[in-house]
Amino acid sequence: MNPQPLRPVIYDEGRDVVRVLDQRRLPSEEVWLDLASCDEVVQAIKDLTVRGAPAIGVAAAYGLALESRRGAEPARLREASERLVHARPTAVNLAWAVRRMSRRLGLGPAALLEEAHAIRDEDEAACRRIGALGAALLPPRASVLTHCNAGALATAGYGTALGVVRAAVEGGNPVTVFADETRPFLQGARLTAWELKRDGIPVTLLTDNMAGWLMAQGEIACVVVGADRIAANGDVANKIGTYALAVLAAYHHLPFYVAAPWSTVDLATPDGSAIPIEERGDEEVVTLAGQRIAPAGVPARYPAFDVTPEPLVTAIITERGVVRRPFAPGLAALAAR
């Protein structure tokens, strides 16, 4: 394991900037960007410079702290809060972090920065607890399939789905990972593979259409994914393609685990039909690495997320505990803790 922790969002108090690792440029180069205003944080979230539900929540919290430290009054901070919440509508952690910061808007810059630091620290601690609980579910020497990137890059640090993998390895279970490339943004190919290679964890890259065959051949022991929103009934919104993996896992009788912090659970959303699904521009689908791969004039769809119905989910792993079906009472019980 790499002894240097990977944290994609940092607040530089000396220069009053939010520093983010530009995830659009990985794995070719590691470039850190200094965001000097809340509007720059909003844009970084929109254009996927920083991505992953918990990570954008941390970035938003720091964006509001930054705006306050630069003299913004509460009314202006409330306007900035609205822009942040609407930057990406599916990930509930973003709205959760902004709501939490909003309760302290009138307390001054120091209080807001303290709260942003707390959101960051609590998320990393949650990821480590999720990792420990999830690692206990993995068979010895398991081959784990994951989708998108639910690692340190997507959180304050350590990761959710990849936190489970890291905790297993740290605990002496030499698991290996199959990473879906995750078209069209290639989070699996560019980010998950990069993270795991950095930590010395064996990873094999798959195109998105290979998982079913490898499951049929007995090469995959389980699926572990992250989440952008979990409804009260256990339906899970995550990166597009997750639903298809869950169907395949169910057909092949493989466990399908969802690892996410409690801030991803949205008990105000009754089921997956109420989760807004972000639609991104088709340019991201018809181009690859700056080159057009489809004929000019051919339209494309890009729903950035899908919803996995709760019957396809084996368990939801949060820092508060592991929940199995029926999810509604289990999640409600965890909420009462």
Curated annotation (Swiss-Prot):
GO terms under biological process: L-methionine salvage from methylthioadenosine
Pathway(s) where this gene product acts: Amino-acid biosynthesis; L-methionine biosynthesis via salvage pathway; L-methionine from S-methyl-5-thio-alpha-D-ribose 1-phosphate: step 1/6
Keyword presence, Amino-acid biosynthesis: yes
Coiled-coil intervals, chain numbering: none
Keywords: Amino-acid biosynthesis, Isomerase, Methionine biosynthesis
Residues involved in substrate binding: 51-53, 88, 187, 238-239
Enzyme class of the recorded protein, top EC level: isomerase
Site entry: Transition state stabilizer: 148
InterPro entries from the UniProt entry: IF-2B-related (IPR000649), IF-M1Pi (IPR005251), IF_2B-like_C (IPR042529), Initiation_fac_2B_a/b/d (IPR011559), M1Pi_N (IPR027363), NagB/RpiA_transferase-like (IPR037171)
Catalytic activity: 5-(methylsulfanyl)-alpha-D-ribose 1-phosphate = 5-(methylsulfanyl)-D-ribulose 1-phosphate
Residues annotated as the enzyme's active site: 228 (proton donor)
Keyword Disulfide bond set for record: no
GO molecular function: S-methyl-5-thioribose-1-phosphate isomerase activity
Stretch forming the signal peptide: none
EC numbers, comma separated: 5.3.1.23
Family classification: Belongs to the eIF-2B alpha/beta/delta subunits family. MtnA subfamily.
Job of this protein: Catalyzes the interconversion of methylthioribose-1-phosphate (MTR-1-P) into methylthioribulose-1-phosphate (MTRu-1-P).
Name by which UniProt lists this protein: Methylthioribose-1-phosphate isomerase
Origin species: Anaeromyxobacter sp. (strain Fw109-5)
Gene label: mtnA
